[in-house]
Structure formats: C-alpha cells, structure tokens
Regions:
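Generic non-transmembrane alpha-helical segments
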Residues: 74-82, 156-164, 213-226, 279-289
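C-terminal substrate-binding/cap subdomain adjacent to the FAD-binding core in PCMH-type
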Residues: 8-204, 208
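A short glycine-rich, hydrophobically flanked beta-strand micro-motif that places a catalytic Asp/Glu
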Residues: 90-97, 227-245, 290-297
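C-terminal structural cap/anchor segments
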Residues: 204, 209-259
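Extended C-terminal subregions enriched in glycine
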Residues: 206-211, 257-258, 263-286
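Extended, charge-rich low-complexity interaction segments
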Residues: 121-138, 201, 265-271, 320-335
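Activity-critical C-terminal alpha-helical subdomain
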Residues: 182-194, 200, 285-336
Length: 336
C-alpha cells in the first residue's frame, strides 16, 4: 500500500477479447476501473511504471510505545508533509503486540530485536501495566552523498517523537537487506512451523477518528488473552494520496488506518481464528466504525452496495460497458 505518484500505464485484457492500452489520458475510465476493481473489468496483463534510482542504505528504526494515543499521534505526525513537501521518513509502518504474546511476537520480528532487547521491552510494558505494546517501524534512506548527515537528520526526527525513553532501536542496513526483511521473518516462522499453515488474514481500513475505538475493542479487548501467531500491522495513510476516481474504496476521512491482522493458524485453530475475525467485524459494525475491508468478499448484494457506497452506480455502469456478460471474476458474487 506504499506507492509513489508516478503515472502507471496498464495494458488490460477485457471480456471482449481485446487488449486495451489505458492511462489517465487514454481510455481513462478503464484505467480507473481496473485499479481496485477486483478483476471485474479486465485483467492487467502489462504495466509501464516509472523507475528512479534506489538508495544504497538506510537507517532502520523501531520505536516502542505503551500508550496507543501517543503512538497514533506520532504516526500521524510522521505522515504529514513538511513545509517543503517532504516527509520525515522514507518508509513508515507500525505494529501492535498484545501483552499475552508480546515476547514471542518480538522474537519473531525477523531477528531485529536481541534477547536483551525483548527482555527490556517486556519489563517496560510490565512497569507501565500496558495491555498492548506498539511499535513504529521507519527508515531513512541515504547514499554516499548524504551519509555524513544521516545520523544528525535521524536524531532531529526522533527528538520530535514521544516513544518510550531509551527504547529506540536503530540498525544500519543496506537497502536490499531492508527490502528483503519479510524473507527473514518467513525463515523465522518456518523454523517454528508457522509458515506452511493456513493464514486467515483480516485487512481493514479504519477511519482515523475511530482508530482509538478499534484499539480498545480489538487490541485491548477481543485479542487480549489470546495466543497470537503472526504480525498485527497498523499505520495511517493520507487520503490525498489516493485517487478517488479509482474503483478502490477507502473511508471518507483525510487520514485512515490500514490494519492487517496477519494470523497464522496453528494447533488446528483455523475455525477459531475465522470466528474471531467475524467477531472483530461484528464489533466494528455494532460500534458504527465506518471501516472498509481490503480485498473484501461478500455473498450478499447489499453488502457490496454498502462497501462501494457512492461508487456503486459508477461501478455497475462500467461493468455493463466492459463486461456486459458478467464473465470476469464471477466467484466474488458481486453480479452473479
């Protein structure tokens, strides 16, 4: 969900058996339709994407929080553009660890934290009587031209944040090492038998005004006392970075959060985790949290209408134009 604003030029295969070149200036309605269109209008068979030189190294930081309000405020500060349009960090994500699974979760974070680090974090959480711990993960890219100043720049950013005192962990890594970080986490999970198992993931986009309610009800409620295998990812996004003419739908607020509960099923608990996911969604529904599921799957037309909201009528019109026989992606039960 991290992308730049450089123009993409998809080549989409439609149900008419055509390959259509499209962009913001050419066949723009198809261009917008296929982006987040769940395969309903065409299949992107080729894309032209502008590239730029990659950095060589980065400062890779993980910052520890025991208070959600402080954590989310710092995250939102970091995604706000500065006066010159730049951002404090090159990359930003976040994670939550519920207390019951805190030590195990930190140890499975791709080897980033040492055993001593884990012990220190667990002790601080206990001292704060924290039911959850939150981590901001961020990088600051640099190359030979900026190597002499990168530490000073990083320190100036960290001074603006309110993480737990003394609990900023920084690695100096090659850019390739950072990009390959998930592979390290995969290897760690594979060693303990948690990779080649079912993964009942739940991905939702939560309005910024309701993320504290989500935290209290889910991280501080439903997931408390459970054994969690897999990362709980949470970070804010600027709606201004999303083109609202695309089929993709997001909450109608300037800032919303991507929350990815990336569970791994162990000990034959798949059904339990699926039921837990439904419990989380029911909580959001009852609390009136206007979330949107990412990669949603509904079986009732009314749920799809609710999901697309104000984009539904346009979605139907484009379906009639580009796939009138309803041949593409019938398994999603949107039109079938």
């Amino acid at each position: 969900m991290h992308h730049n604003d450089k123009q993409r030029l998809p080549f989409a295969g439609t149900s008419h058996g055509e390959t259509v070149t499209c962009s913001k200036d050419l066949n723009s309605d198809l261009f917008d339709a296929v982006l987040g269109g769940l395969g309903q209008f065409g299949v992107i068979v080729r894309a032209r994407i502008a590239l730029e030189p990659a950095p060589t190294r980065n400062k890779w930081a993980r910052l520890i929080y025991t208070d959600f309000a402080t954590f989310s405020a710092d995250q939102e500060k970091l995604i706000a553009p500065r006066s010159d349009g730049s951002f404090a960090f090159s990359y930003l994500e976040g994670a939550a660890y519920v207390n019951h699974s805190l030590a195990a979760g930190l140890k499975n974070a791709g080897g980033f934290f040492s055993d001593a680090d884990v012990a220190t974090i667990v002790a601080r959480a206990a001292a704060r009587n924290a039911t959850s711990v939150y981590v901001i993960e961020a990088t600051l890219n640099y190359d030979n031209a900026t190597a002499a100043s990168v530490d000073e720049v990083l320190d100036s950013v960290l001074k603006e944040l309110r993480f737990e005192e003394g609990l900023a962990f920084v690695h100096d890594a090659s850019y390739v090492e950072f990009l390959d970080r998930v592979h390290g986490e995969e290897m760690a999970l594979e060693k303990i038998g948690l990779w080649h198992v079912p993964h009942p993931w739940l991905n939702v986009l939560v309005p910024g005004s309701r993320i504290a309610d989500f935290d209290r009800g889910v991280f501080g409620g439903i997931l408390q006392g459970t054994d969690i295998a897999g990362p709980l990812v949470i970070y804010p996004l600027n709606k201004s970075k999303w083109d609202d003419s695309m089929s993709a739908v997001t909450p109608a607020e300037d800032v919303f959060y991507a929350v990815s509960l990336l569970f791994s099923s162990v000990a034959n608990d798949l059904k339990k985790l699926e039921a837990q996911n439904q419990k989380i969604l029911r909580f959001c529904d009852l609390a009136g949290i206007g979330y949107k599921e990412y990669l949603a799957h509904y079986t009732v037309r009314g749920d799809w209408v609710r999901h697309f909201g104000g984009k539904w009528d346009r979605f139907v019109q484009l379906k009639d134009k580009y796939d009138p026989k309803k041949l593409l992606s019938p398994g999603q039960d949107i039109f079938n």
